[in-house]
Amino acid sequence: MIYESFNGVAAPILATFAWCIGIGLSSYCLVFKTRLFSHLITSPLAPPFLALPAIMFAFLMAFMSSEAWQNFSHARTALINESSAISQILNIPIQPPEFQKSSNLYVQSYLGSVLTDEWSAKHHNESSSLEAQNSLDKLESNVWKVSGACNQGANKSHTCTDPIAISAIIKALGDLRNARTQRLSLGYQEGVDTKWFLGIFLGFIAALAVAAVHRSNAKTGATALVLFCLSMWISFSMVTLYINPYKWADRLDPAPLGLILETLKSGHNR
């Protein structure tokens, strides 16, 4: 959707307001300004009829609200898992020391790329960073070098890293990749336009039903449409504001990742 190109909280609010104005005006014009619904003056619809499309619209909004909450919950879990995996990688000792130092540098490079590129105000986790991916690959390659050097006995002068520690690092790397993939998949929202178009169309049908039930009185119909469209605007706004956990209202803050990066830069890790 066009509003997704803007970062401000006002973008989805104004976009949904425009949707609802368009729905209300088009419904009013179709019902009261054309002959399509003129027969309802003499043969009106039963008032309970308007509840059917409205209930369907309410169910759709409930479904989309649930999806928005799940997105936020999954995004928060992914952030926790990502920071936890990085902390585990940093806290497991690697021998010889030069491998430990290079691993820390790769982690620092990964965090820097993730925070400046993927979490940036420009991308909002919508696309992956090639630098971050390269840092992950180099980090994993470094771990395998440690394992290979010990297995071949190439570093007899140094204490080899315990195989259990290497297994733990490899598992943490897998957890880190999975958490990053989940974060990026939640940030990519380009494929949901069809759902919004169907929601707008269902809202239009519900507004049309509200106007059609009041066909005999234009003023009453206009009042009902205004109230319904205002309610629809609030529903649309709430969903659009929270559907993406990395943009607009209540967006996640990568503070745990930033804290780890600051710790690495200050040299507190080995």
What name fits each language-model region?
Residues 59-80, 243:
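Transmembrane signal-anchor/signal-peptide helices with a preference for the extracytoplasmic
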Residues 37-40:
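Amphipathic, cytosolic membrane-interfacial segments at TM-TM junctions
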Residues 78-95, 253-267:
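Short extracytoplasmic/periplasmic juxtamembrane "stem" segments immediately C-terminal to an N-terminal membrane anchor
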Residues 25-26, 55, 61, 82-85, ...:
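Amphipathic, well-ordered alpha-helical segments in soluble domains
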Residues 2-34, 184-270:
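Alpha-helical transmembrane anchor segments
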Residues 88-186:
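Structured inter-helical modules in multipass membrane proteins
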Residues 42-46:
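Juxtamembrane helix-capping/reentrant segments at transmembrane boundaries
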Residues 47-64:
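A generic, lipid-embedded transmembrane alpha helix
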